[in-house]
Amino acid sequence: MLEVASARDRDWAGALVRDNMAEAYRRHGLAWDPARFAADWAGGENYLLRCDGGAVGYLRLLRHAGRSYLQDLQVVAERRGLGLGTQALEQAKALVRGRGEAALRLKVFADSPAVRLYRRHGFVELLNEPPLIGMECRLP
């Protein structure tokens, strides 16, 4: 279940994103930028994914120009493959739909395994900006 993250959760969430994205960043010649994460945290809607009483993931939504973007969806390594990412994604879509918005957008590395998850949940490719692709899910 998603719950609103507090300021004290920022370091944990940042470490999760940094660790989960390390291989993709290395592959694409990028470096982790803690200042960028802090700025994104400050400008976004931050949620922890909780299961069995503990934090097992992190999700951030960003509103820009009247649209909502899924900026981060991370699950701790030992809890992947259990449907937690799906659960968080569906809750994020419900949050955005509840605001009366018609779509949720995101950008993801084109070679990320997450692309399959997003496609299974109705996201389609809108643009190709290597190494990223932009995707959108229309919300009924």
Feature map (PLM): residue ranges:
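Short hydrophobic/aromatic beta-strand element in the GNAT-like acyltransferase core
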Residues: E45-L48, Y58, D72, R105, ...
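Conserved acetyl-CoA-binding loop-helix of GNAT-fold acetyltransferases
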Residues: V75, G81-A94, R116-R120
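Conserved beta-strand in the GNAT
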Residues: G54-L62, R67-Q74
